[in-house]
Amino acid sequence: MEFATVSPPDPGTAAAARARQDTLTKPRGALGRLEDLSVWIAACQGQCPPRQFERARVVVFAGDHGVARCGVSAYPPEVTAQMVANFDAGGAAINALAGVAGASVRVADLAVDADPPDDRIGAHKVRRGSGDITVQDALTAEETERALSAGAAIADEEVDAGADLLIAGDMGIGNTTAAAVLVAALTNVEPVVAVGFGTGIDDAGWARKTAAVRDALFRARRVLPDPVALLRCAGGADLAALAGFCAQAAVRRTPLLLDGMAVTAAALVAEHLAPGARLWWQAGHRSTEPGHALALTALDLEPILDLRMRLGEGTGAALALPIVRAAVAALSSMATFAQAGVSDPSAHP
């Protein structure tokens, strides 16, 4: 599918927000990164001061990967379906952390190798499991288009229902292997640079994972620079849908927090699908996965948090949401020097 042209967050509002920051009762720049985040949010909303987020929404994209059969994960493939049920029941880490952050959670089954728990979760399902990318394409061309369209449709559904901030999450045994292939292909690095320990594999597991990425990357590099072909060859329905989701959020002018390795790998592809989409995103955190840092650098995104996390699900991004909320509160609720009757040092050089 083709995405509409992405226009950037409003530069005039960004300038107004920066100017307002300089009038608040604090030394200029004293709130550091919070000031930058507040300017970004104001520009995304097109208003200064910005309004607090009322309906932050986490969407977890779930899918199985054939490459998991190569021994690249510490967990068996059936865990994906089990975790989908856990998300729906409210028992996963993302449910707990999103609750603290004031966000609600949706899980979407794109390619879990099991029947979905209900039609709501499986409404956009493309297939059961994606192909083993070491020896075959993850998807057919038609499935790739369906997955991209599904991700875009999910973004539209959430924005149309009132979501004012989106968080992209993931679940899928083997998905960091596919993600490492995407990142290595788009940043032109070798597998050993992009591969991490994922779910906690040992050294032998890391060697198997690196070999799988090597084999898949050999195939993936043949289709560059086509981002859709890359998703077909080495992604998966969940990662393709994530790419569509991230791109469409930007088209819909809705700020989005990226999570870890799988999400950011998909976002890197999304930036190629919809140039300029990255201006609507912030990196919630930096994962311990080495490929995540590569993807963030390629997107020119600075992570908000670094807590040595590597879970996925949207957890790192959810933890960053209270900081983003604090940035909004500072810009919108603090008094100016004039309002507070406090002398402004900048007015008396």
Swiss-Prot record:
Give the pathway annotation. Nucleoside biosynthesis; alpha-ribazole biosynthesis; alpha-ribazole from 5,6-dimethylbenzimidazole: step 1/2
Q: Which reactions does this protein catalyse?
A: 5,6-dimethylbenzimidazole + nicotinate beta-D-ribonucleotide = alpha-ribazole 5'-phosphate + nicotinate + H(+)
| InterPro entries the record matches | Nict_dMeBzImd_PRibTrfase, Nict_dMeBzImd_PRibTrfase_bact, Nict_dMeBzImd_PRibTrfase_N, Nict_dMeBzImd_PRibTrfase_sf
Q: Where are the stretches annotated Disordered?
A: 1-20
Catalytic residues (UniProt)? E313 (proton acceptor)
One GO MF annotation is: nicotinate-nucleotide-dimethylbenzimidazole phosphoribosyltransferase activity
PANTHER family according to UniProt: NICOTINATE-NUCLEOTIDE--DIMETHYLBENZIMIDAZOLE PHOSPHORIBOSYLTRANSFERASE (PTHR43463:SF1)
What the protein does comes down to: Catalyzes the synthesis of alpha-ribazole-5'-phosphate from nicotinate mononucleotide (NAMN) and 5,6-dimethylbenzimidazole (DMB).
Protein family according to the UniProt entry: Belongs to the CobT family.
Identification of the protein by name? Nicotinate-nucleotide--dimethylbenzimidazole phosphoribosyltransferase
What species was this sequence derived from? Mycolicibacterium paratuberculosis (strain ATCC BAA-968 / K-10) (Mycobacterium paratuberculosis)
The encoding gene is cobT
